[in-house]
Each structure stands twice: as structure tokens, then as C-alpha cells.
């Protein structure tokens, strides 16, 4: 499948208005606008690769334009949307930012509620991660340097997939080595479930604890970077604080970054070129991958 390459042209026109959309709270429009500069980036993209038979089981691979001397880290990213909505096409700016940082990046779709309930989207996450590990070498990546990353609901997928080994084991392949987890504004400790659709999605009630990453912390978990905005009204900062504390109590290396005056969307929006001044998300990701890859 041929790749499309971003052109090195002026980004000024494409970037105009993105910041205003986010500041106005138009997050959906902001994410769409954030992809405008990504079109002009220095990377290769392989789009709509199937990792399963369902229409939503598709992923895009982004890789640096320049060849590497040695295999690169591989980052698998899942979008947010309360497990109900979202699409990888909205997050081209994430793939571009990470590829331009030197990582082979996989941006994966997954089935949403109500098409599936728990554990349906976890099964999709497992399949995407296994696909990324199995095919990393085809894109210049190292399967032993695999990072799982997500924003909001996607961060929940990344954390639970890493901490609860049942999902990767059930996929029928040898579980890959996970070098680290990068969670942006993730829900990790969100009981009780108050909304009827949440209760249905994660139910029945005896199964509610199965949805909580914090209930599966273990001493052999890989290093984690947990990023949270202190102005997040969608996923409270206690989620990242509590998971970090539980992991640290077991001796797991955790980097907790709490950004003042940063919202739920800001942590991921800061990966697009114009908005990188809003939060140091990309710099913290680069530092984390650099440390944990040594």
C-alpha cells in the first residue's frame, strides 16, 4: 500500500483559527482543524490497514520520513470519546507529531458502545496492539520497544490492556513486551458509575470493578507516564493521582505530570503544532520514551 508524504510548505494559513476553536470550546472542530498542519508534515502514512474483519478494526501507521540506523520505538494510540465516538481520522495530528519525533506510530480505531460493550473495545485494543507488534519491523519499528498510549477513553484502553493480562492472552498470540504506557487525561478509577449508559456498557454490576485499571496494578507493570490537566472537568485529576500512587506503592516507575490551567482536551490538542505552548505534552512524551528506552 503506497504511503502519502506531507509536503514541506508554509503552515501559517493552515494553522489559522485552530487555537480559537479550542479556546471557544469547539473541541470537535478544533480536532478537525488541528489536522490541517499535519497534512504538511515530514512523515509517511499508511492508511486504513485492517487488523480484524469489522469495519472499525482499522488503523493508520505513521513513520518518520528518514530511514533510521536502528529500529524505532513503536507507539499505539487510541482516541477518546467516552467509548462511544471518535475516529482515527481526527487524530492525524497525533500520528504526525509522534512520527516527526522519531516513532513509528499506530493510530487505531475500535468498536464503540452501543455496538459493543465491555470487553468488546478491549478485545479490539488487544488485536491492534498485537498487530502493531507483529508488523513493527515492516515499518522500521522494534516490537520490543512498544508503547501503548491514549487520550481519555483511549488512555483507559492502554492502561487496562497493560495491567490486566487477560485481554492480550485471550487474543491467542504471545503477548508483546510493553515498554511503557502514556495516558493523557485517562479514567482509571471512576467508580461508582452514575450514568445509565455507563452502567449498561460496563455491567452487570458484579463486573464494574473489572473496568477499573486501578484494580489491576501489579509490581511488574511497565513504566507509565500519566498526564492530566488540573482544569479537567471531564475526567477528574484524582484518576491519574490515584493510579500513580497505587503503582508507586508497588515500586513501578511512574511519571505524573499535572498541568495547571489545562483542560481535558488540551493534553492531546497540545500535540498539534500551533498549540504546543498550551501544555508540554510532546516534550514530556519524548523525555519518557527516551528514559524508558535506555
Where are these regions (language model features)?
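N-terminal cap/lid segment of alpha/beta-hydrolase-fold proteins
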Residues: 31-67
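Short beta-strand/loop motif that positions the catalytic acidic residue
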Residues: 226-228, 232
Amino acid at each position: 500500500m503506497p504511503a502519502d508524504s506531507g509536503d514541506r510548505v508554509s503552515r501559517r494559513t493552515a494553522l489559522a483559527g485552530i487555537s480559537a476553536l479550542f479556546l471557544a470550546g469547539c473541541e470537535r472542530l478544533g480536532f478537525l482543524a488541528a489536522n490541517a498542519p499535519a497534512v504538511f508534515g515530514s512523515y509517511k502514512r499508511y492508511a486504513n490497514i485492517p487488523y480484524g474483519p469489522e469495519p472499525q478494526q482499522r488503523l493508520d501507521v505513521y513513520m518518520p520520513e528518514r530511514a533510521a540506523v536502528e529500529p524505532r520505538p513503536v507507539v499505539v494510540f487510541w482516541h477518546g470519546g467516552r467509548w462511544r465516538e471518535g475516529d482515527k481520522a481526527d487524530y492525524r495530528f497525533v500520528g504526525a507529531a509522534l512520527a516527526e519525533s522519531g516513532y513509528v506510530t499506530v493510530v487505531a480505531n475500535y468498536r464503540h458502545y452501543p455496538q459493543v460493550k465491555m470487553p468488546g473495545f478491549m478485545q479490539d485494543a488487544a488485536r491492534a496492539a498485537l498487530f502493531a507488534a507483529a508488523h513493527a519491523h515492516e515499518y522500521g519499528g522494534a516490537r520490543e520497544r512498544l508503547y501503548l498510549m491514549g487520550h481519555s477513553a483511549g488512555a483507559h484502553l492502554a492502561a487496562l490492556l497493560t495491567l490486566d493480562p487477560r485481554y492480550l492472552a485471550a487474543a491467542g498470540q504471545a503477548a508483546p513486551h510493553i515498554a511503557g504506557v502514556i495516558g493523557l487525561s485517562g479514567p482509571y478509577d471512576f467508580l461508582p458509575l452514575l450514568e445509565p449508559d455507563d452502567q449498561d456498557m460496563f455491567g452487570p454490576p458484579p463486573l464494574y470493578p473489572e473496568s477499573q485499571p486501578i484494580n489491576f496494578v501489579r509490581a511488574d507493570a511497565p513504566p507509565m507516564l500519566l498526564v492530566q490537566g488540573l482544569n479537567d472537568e471531564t475526567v477528574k485529576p484524582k484518576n491519574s493521582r490515584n493510579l500513580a500512587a497505587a503503582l508507586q506503592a508497588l515500586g513501578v516507575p511512574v511519571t505524573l505530570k499535572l498541568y495547571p490551567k489545562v483542560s481535558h482536551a488540551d493534553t492531546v490538542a497540545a500535540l498539534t503544532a500551533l498549540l504546543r505552548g498550551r501544555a508540554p505534552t510532546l516534550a514530556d512524551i519524548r523525555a519518557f520514551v527516551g528514559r524508558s528506552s535506555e
